[in-house]
Amino acid sequence: MFRIRGQGPWEINLGCNFGCKHCYLGERPFSGLGWKDKVRLLDIMRAAGVLWLQITGGEPTMDPHFQGAYRYAWQAGMMLTISTNGSLLWRPDLLRLFRDCPPYRLVVSMYGASEESFDTLTQRRGAWKAFRRGMDAAREAGLPLRINVVVTEDNASEADEMAALADEWNVENHAYTNMTPTIYGGGEPLLAQSAAHLRQRKPFAGCNAGHTFFHADPHAKVSICKVGRDDQIDLMAEGIDGLTRLGTIADRLMLRTGGCEGCALSGTCRVCRPLAKHYQEARAPLHSYCQHGDKETAS
């Protein structure tokens, strides 16, 4: 039997109550598996050896089966991390769920330190108030929190304030500054970046995508990761045996092909091949992902 013995991020639903300008998902349809198929997917993940399950979205807590799926996975012995915008964490039913079945971590994205910047980036009036309400409730409940401080052009002037607010709450935080194209190769998220806050990536040193972890979308289409979604495996059709092809798919997708084939600088490339492909599809400036583009910025 195939056993991956690692992680299995799962997009339970792409639907979201925010409309963030920088979102890498692009289109966010509210759709996903029915309850029975969600249970079947979780059973397959457990049989495959998934120990750490990250449930994400969209906004995962909006899915009609989120609480049932979360509890089922928790009772199966998985360590659970939830990626959320925090806007619904005030709900009593969610607080009871996390009290009864403690998560390993709730990773909450912060999109500003003021109502104006937060609501502008999320393109939703009232988003800031919902975020603060959710965070106040989560902190009072003692939930294990981490904050991703998302820095964009809309909130760049508040980057230090966002980090300071997270520190004031005594919540571990990390600044996220470099956006990526959408999973469809759209360049819209790149337009939201704050040029002054972009960081130079370290050389890509390889990863175990498809070998020690995989990614499942809302319809149980499995890929090596959330970026490299080519050659997806339909777990509802193939079952656990379909996962045996993941390693071969991963090795093929990581090959330096297309415009990267034969590159003399591949040993110090800053992005993996699947991510480079998205940048190329988005017609992004070369310097945003490739060392060859450094000459453009230097001149």
Language-model regions: role of each:
Residues 9-12, 16, 256-259, 265, ...:
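Short metal-coordination and nucleic-acid-contact micro-motifs, chiefly zinc-binding Cys/His arrays
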Residues 207-211:
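Short, small/polar residue-rich loop motifs at catalytic or cofactor-binding pockets
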Residues 17, 60-62, 86-90, 104, ...:
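Conserved radical SAM core fold
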Residues 142-143, 179-202, 221-279:
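C-terminal accessory region of radical SAM enzymes
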Residues 11, 48-54, 74-83, 102-110, ...:
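Conserved C-terminal portion of the radical SAM core fold
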Residues 25-33, 229, 233, 266-298:
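Iron-sulfur (Fe-S) cluster-binding segments and ferredoxin-like electron-carrier domains
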